[in-house]
């Protein structure tokens, strides 16, 4: 009798994706982050669902409904902090996943990579709208500042901002629609992740060497299922440690103050995972220029496959490219630090230099370095 998992219409899809999938025998722990992102998404959807049962998207009651969740709902505090810190874990995994793709040349799978960039935008949009929902000071002012950036768009800017606000300022209408979008987007992200996997399984996984691994494949189960479970356990360990020992470590104290349109906080800043983009935005004195730089800071990832000039796919055997890759990582960490600092000397100039270096590295330095390495190999 034929195995049911190979014949049943639904089970054979699961089988070909997670059980009998041929995988390269040498993929390292850097390939764990795809499954970790899936786990993060499931955690976020489940905790978000339970939070939505008690949350009210009204300016008068939003803040107190979050307080009610933490104080009166059974394990409400746990669900709320799992959701808030789960977002941070999501972004840590995302950045490491993208970094892995850049280092090992995974961007050469064009469709998979482009869906990934789209996913990054969708997750960032979801996280931004989620940050507005508790209706604290930083929620309100963060929403005001970021949505106001759209007014930099010529001709239609002002109308567009008022259309998004649903009025003349961030108010009840804005909060209600942000809640609606924040609820629906994770399901769209889940669907996109399915498409991401579909395209990936058309080509098969890349591997650290960047070479074709068709001659040496192993089944996904049990080898990589066990490996992924180890990653998931470590992720849950870090997340629960964060939630149970210092749940507010990555949050902003200002968000424990009810939103007040008449009182601007001294330093408006987003969550830590947006700080690098926020630093790039702030480093350009012109409003429209800043908005373009902000969008390009993520959109530049879509250009990476077209800037690949090396004869080798992976950076594994390219020491000079490796060097510039780690400079790029250091530059992003610098931008993250600058994004959390006040707009004053010397932070302004450091932010401007780090922003220029970010675009220079991706668009100019790394492609030229790859050409230089080709010559070293007499190719």
Swiss-Prot record:
One of its GO terms (cellular component) is mitochondrial inner membrane. It is found in: Mitochondrion inner membrane. Its main location: mitochondrion. InterPro entries: Cyt_b/b6_C (IPR005798), Cyt_b/b6_C_sf (IPR036150), Cyt_b/b6_N (IPR005797), Cytb/b6-like_sf (IPR027387), Cytochrome_b (IPR030689), Cytochrome_b_C_euk/bac (IPR048260), Cytochrome_b_N_euk/bac (IPR048259), Di-haem_cyt_TM (IPR016174). One of its GO terms (biological process) is mitochondrial electron transport, ubiquinol to cytochrome c. Signal peptide: none annotated. Keywords: Electron transport, Heme, Iron, Membrane, Metal-binding, Mitochondrion, Mitochondrion inner membrane, Respiratory chain, Transmembrane, Transmembrane helix, Transport, Ubiquinone. GO terms for molecular function: metal ion binding; ubiquinol-cytochrome-c reductase activity. It is a multi-pass membrane protein. The keyword Transcription does not apply. The keyword Transmembrane applies. CDD domains: cytochrome_b_C (cd00290), Cytochrome_b_N (cd00284). Pfam families: Cytochrom_B_C (PF00032), Cytochrome_B (PF00033). Heme b b562 binds at residues 83, 182. Its cofactor is heme b. A ubiquinone binds at residue 201. The cytochrome bc1 complex contains 11 subunits: 3 respiratory subunits (MT-CYB, CYC1 and UQCRFS1), 2 core proteins (UQCRC1 and UQCRC2) and 6 low-molecular weight proteins (UQCRH/QCR6, UQCRB/QCR7, UQCRQ/QCR8, UQCR10/QCR9, UQCR11/QCR10 and a cleavage product of UQCRFS1). This cytochrome bc1 complex then forms a dimer. Component of the ubiquinol-cytochrome c reductase complex (complex III or cytochrome b-c1 complex) that is part of the mitochondrial respiratory chain. The b-c1 complex mediates electron transfer from ubiquinol to cytochrome c. Contributes to the generation of a proton gradient across the mitochondrial membrane that is then used for ATP synthesis. Heme 1 (or BL or b562) is low-potential and absorbs at about 562 nm, and heme 2 (or BH or b566) is high-potential and absorbs at about 566 nm. Belongs to the cytochrome b family. This is Cytochrome b. The gene is MT-CYB.
């Amino acid at each position: 009798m034929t195995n049911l998992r190979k014949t049943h219409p639904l089970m054979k899809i699961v089988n070909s994706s997670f059980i009998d999938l041929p995988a390269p025998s040498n993929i390292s722990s850097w390939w764990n982050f795809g499954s970790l992102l899936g786990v993060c998404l499931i955690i976020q959807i489940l905790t978000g669902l339970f939070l939505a049962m008690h949350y009210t998207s009204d300016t008068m009651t939003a803040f107190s409904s979050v307080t009610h969740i933490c104080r009166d709902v059974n394990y409400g505090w746990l669900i709320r902090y799992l959701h808030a810190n789960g977002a941070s874990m999501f972004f840590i995994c995302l950045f490491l996943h993208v970094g892995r793709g850049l280092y090992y040349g995974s961007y050469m799978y064009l469709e998979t990579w482009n869906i990934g960039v789209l996913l990054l935008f969708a997750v960032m949009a979801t996280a931004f709208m989620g940050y507005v929902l508790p209706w604290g000071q930083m929620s309100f002012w963060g929403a005001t500042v970021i949505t106001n950036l759209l007014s930099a768009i010529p001709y239609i800017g002002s109308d567009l901002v008022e259309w998004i606000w649903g009025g003349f300022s961030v108010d009840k209408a804005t909060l209600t629609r942000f809640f609606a979008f924040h609820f629906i987007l994770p399901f769209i992200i889940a669907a996109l992740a399915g498409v991401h996997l579909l395209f990936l399984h058309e080509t098969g996984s890349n591997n650290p060497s960047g070479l074709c691994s068709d001659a040496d494949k192993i089944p996904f189960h049990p080898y990589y299922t066990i490996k992924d479970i180890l990653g998931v356990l470590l992720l849950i360990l870090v997340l629960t440690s964060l939630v149970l020992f210092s749940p507010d470590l990555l949050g902003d104290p200002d968000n424990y103050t009810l939103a007040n349109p008449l009182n601007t906080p001294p330093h408006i800043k987003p969550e830590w995972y947006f700080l690098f983009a926020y630093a790039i935005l702030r480093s350009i004195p012109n409003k429209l220029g800043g908005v373009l730089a902000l969008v390009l800071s993520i959109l530049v990832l879509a250009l990476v496959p077209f800037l690949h000039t090396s004869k080798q796919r992976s950076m594994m055997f390219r020491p000079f490219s490796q060097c510039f890759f780690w400079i790029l990582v250091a530059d992003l960490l610098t931008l993250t630090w600058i994004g959390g600092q006040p707009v004053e000397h010397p932070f302004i100039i450091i932010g401007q230099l780090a922003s220029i270096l970010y675009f220079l590295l991706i668009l100019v330095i790394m492609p030229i370095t790859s050409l230089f390495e080709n010559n070293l190999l007499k190719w």
